[in-house]
């Protein structure tokens, strides 16, 4: 078994980068939900880093949290981005926060730039919901469609759902999309898709868990077809049971609709059935991904690696830190 640590394949980039807006201060380069969650975990003042807090307060909170975030992949990504954007700046630290801020804002006043201009070279992937406009992304960012955002809320005609799905897929294709993320929650139960029952379910304002699972299965089938047509990679995030995951994959393997897949294992102790399915399905390219966030402690992560290596003795398993921010 060969494990390879790899960068996260999509990211929760801040709006200034996602929308390629003019940058006025360094905090705009990393102020986003995933970083905010980290700062809250380090006991940052919620008022200081909330929506009503100042950008300088946010930057200061990040600097103060650095000792707590030592070795954290997200924090390292932010520091790398700041070093790339301001190569001659002082070191980022709580002691230097005011000096760094003054230097960086001064540079941005002298040389105005947009969010996309400060990204280091190389293509990266940005997770986007269906309602977003991927065309606003900088050219160095390729959109990854978060498929669950295509699930209809309330009543909808099947024709309208298909038309809206096709519109979104076309927009993402035009923006250079190569991958679709498809989360499957612990509540998902495999229900074989049936056009008649799908149409009936779409007419309902409220749906039972089984009816919601039916629509999820139908949407998964639609994403399989799209990925095959565009030669995209489908990335199911299986938080459901192994039996449900294998039932879903087997259904579309039999119909010939299953594309190349890359999936996250989650808790490997409950994944033997899914791992064996991967091992014995050579006609489909299945690549498990271990999420570093599933076992943050090094000892637990090593044990998870060993367990997957024992259950999945062939092929290549990737390891992703998976914290939601880009890793350069």
Name what the model sees in each region.
Residues 227, 234, 238-240:
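Extended alpha-helical solenoid scaffold regions that build the rod-like backbones
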Residues 245:
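Divalent-cation-assisted or electrostatically stabilized phosphate/pyrophosphate-binding catalytic cores
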């Amino acid at each position: 078994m060969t494990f390879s640590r790899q960068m996260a394949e999509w990211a929760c980039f801040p709006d200034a980068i996602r929308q390629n807006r003019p940058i006025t201060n360094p905090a705009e380069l990393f102020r986003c939900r995933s970083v905010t969650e980290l700062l809250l975990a380090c006991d940052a003042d919620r008022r200081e880093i909330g929506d009503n807090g100042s950008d300088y307060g946010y930057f200061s909170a990040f600097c103060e949290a650095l000792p707590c975030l030592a070795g954290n992949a997200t924090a390292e990504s932010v520091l790398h981005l700041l070093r790339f954007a301001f190569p001659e700046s002082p070191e980022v630290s709580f002691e230097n926060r005011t000096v760094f801020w003054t230097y960086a804002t001064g540079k941005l006043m002298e040389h105005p730039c947009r969010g996309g201009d400060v990204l280091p070279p190389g293509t990266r992937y940005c997770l986007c919901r269906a309602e977003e406009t991927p065309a606003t992304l900088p050219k160095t960012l390729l959109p990854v469609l978060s498929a669950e955002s295509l699930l209809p809320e309330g009543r909808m005609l099947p024709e309208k759902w298909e038309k809206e799905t096709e519109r979104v897929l076309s927009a993402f294709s035009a923006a250079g999309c190569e991958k679709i993320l498809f989360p499957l929650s612990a509540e998902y139960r495999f229900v074989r898709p049936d056009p008649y029952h799908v149409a009936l379910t779409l007419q309902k304002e409220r749906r039972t868990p089984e009816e919601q699972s039916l629509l999820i299965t139908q949407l998964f089938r639609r994403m399989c077809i799209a990925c095959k047509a565009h030669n995209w990679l489908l990335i199911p995030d299986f938080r459901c049971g192994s039996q449900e995951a294998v039932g879903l994959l087997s259904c579309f393997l039999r119909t010939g609709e299953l594309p190349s897949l890359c999936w996250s294992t989650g808790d490997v102790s409950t994944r033997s059935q899914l791992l064996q399915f991967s091992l014995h399905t050579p006609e489909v390219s299945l690549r498990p991904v271990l999420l570093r966030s599933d076992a943050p402690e090094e000892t637990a992560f090593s044990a998870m690696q060993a367990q997957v290596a024992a259950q999945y003795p062939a092929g290549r398993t990737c390891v992703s830190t998976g914290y939601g921010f880009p890793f350069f």
